[in-house]
Amino acid sequence: MELFLTGVVLKPKGLKGELKVKPVTDFPESFLTRREYYIGKTPEDAVLRKVQSARFHQGFAWLVFEGAGSREGAEALVGCGLYVTRDALVAMPDDRAYIHELIGLDVFDETEGRVGKISDVLQMPAHDVYEVDTGDRKVLIPAVEDFITETDLEKGMVRLKRFKEFL
């Protein structure tokens, strides 16, 4: 089963097992409605836990999980990731995509044709950057409209312009 990271447990609060969670999703409001997460240091060791209560405050989710209703139970989860299955992911708007959907897409330049595949997406402060593996080297392309002209998940491709500028 493939799991996707949506948050990271930072620290416990109080004596009743409440956890401060840093969202790593574009949809932090989903923490208020999601009733279960896989929790673990890695996706491979994550176990399913039910949410007992959830609130959102100052950019962080505050969660209590069943079976972790004490400070000691909460402390054991510090540093763990909160994961969800693919079918539990929030649907992206048409003009957006999850990183896992972009990795592996073929990259085409408007004049050069196919130039490689997206091998990674780097999340930078200003905008994402696509790492394109050309076979000979890896090239970093800013994921902005000035360079990316089309992203088609169904066709499995990204079209860009001015690829030679990055070589």
Curated annotation (Swiss-Prot):
InterPro entries: PRC_barrel-like_sf, PRC_RimM, RimM, RimM_N, RimM_N_sf, Transl_B-barrel_sf. One of its GO terms (molecular function) is ribosome binding. Keywords: Chaperone, Cytoplasm, Ribosome biogenesis, rRNA processing. GO terms for cellular component: cytoplasm; ribosome. Its main location: cytoplasm. An accessory protein needed during the final step in the assembly of 30S ribosomal subunit, possibly for assembly of the head region. Essential for efficient processing of 16S rRNA. May be needed both before and after RbfA during the maturation of 16S rRNA. It has affinity for free ribosomal 30S subunits but not for 70S ribosomes. Binds ribosomal protein uS19. Belongs to the RimM family. This is Ribosome maturation factor RimM. The lineage of its organism: Bacteria, Pseudomonadati, Chlorobiota, Chlorobiia, Chlorobiales.
